[in-house]
Amino acid sequence: MLLTIDVGNTNTVLGVFDGDQLANSWRVRTDPRATADELGWLYRGLLGDHPIGGVSVCSTVPAALREIRRMVSRTFPAMPTVVVEPGTRTGVPILIDNPKEAGADRIMNTLAAHHLYGGPAIVVDFGTATNIDVVSARGEFLGGAFAPGIEVALDALASRAAQLRNVELTTPRSVIGKSTVEALQSGMIYGVVGQVDALVRRIRAELGTPATTIATGGLAPLVIKESETLDNHEPHLTLIGLRLVFEKNTEPR
């Protein structure tokens, strides 16, 4: 079985693949201060009896990645391991001004989106940031857009407005909020829906083609049911990309 690890700024998602099927997955908080030993103890507890035969990792948090590397070498010694970083063979041409700026998670999403849906495609990843990644018909990474994630926007508003507070992120009864809580929920949910729909429409116009869209990330379910432009939901798109890149780097050439 293959262990895939996607280290994000807020959460780390782990998945275990049996062949090309995702057998199990977990979401835990990312703690850049966690040591390799602590991570090994946590991951072994989650994995239980899953017989791990390889590891594939991507990270947007450099401090966490250092300890993940140590954890893998101690907990899964001598196993085939792929860490996605500049120079890793992904099969994805990166057509931006500085290819080294492209986050590993964005390249994994590009790889998986083209594998599953072909192209052109637009990936919208709802996490700490809302990342929009554009994939060409040939599977090239063309760039995209960043916006604050829903939780980041809510935290910022609650911290700067004296009479506002964090609320549960759920769809309110109506767009017109009848309480402070509902007004916040409306602004957060429908605000992001409008933002994403507007960006997708502009990107499609710039591409000159009705590119398919794929929503992923932990907060995608909140948005996709209200969106007019999000066609598909792949909750584990990044993990699928990690499986594909592992295969590209471990299969005999």
UniProtKB/Swiss-Prot annotation:
Protein name: Type III pantothenate kinase
Pfam families named in the record: Pan_kinase
Cofactors, names only: NH4(+); K(+)
Cellular compartments annotated: Cytoplasm
Origin superkingdom: Bacteria
GO BP terms, alphabetized: coenzyme A biosynthetic process
Catalytic activity reported: (R)-pantothenate + ATP = (R)-4'-phosphopantothenate + ADP + H(+)
Classification of source organism: Bacteria, Bacillati, Actinomycetota, Actinomycetes, Frankiales
Cofactor binding note from Swiss-Prot or TrEMBL: A monovalent cation. Ammonium or potassium.
Keywords in alphabetical order: ATP-binding, Coenzyme A biosynthesis, Cytoplasm, Kinase, Metal-binding, Nucleotide-binding, Potassium, Transferase
Active-site positions on this chain: 105
Family: Belongs to the type III pantothenate kinase family.
InterPro entries reported for this sequence: ATPase_NBD, Type_III_PanK
Gene Ontology CC annotation, any one: cytoplasm
Pathway assigned to this chain's UniProt record: Cofactor biosynthesis; coenzyme A biosynthesis; CoA from (R)-pantothenate: step 1/5
Enzyme class: transferase
Gene encoding the protein: coaX
EC number: 2.7.1.33
CDD domains: ASKHA_NBD_PanK-III (cd24015)
Residue sites binding substrate per the record: 103-106, 180
Residues involved in ATP binding: 6-13, 128
Entry function: Catalyzes the phosphorylation of pantothenate (Pan), the first step in CoA biosynthesis.
Record-level Gene Ontology MF annotations: ATP binding; metal ion binding; pantothenate kinase activity
Binding residues for K(+): 125
Subunit details: Homodimer.
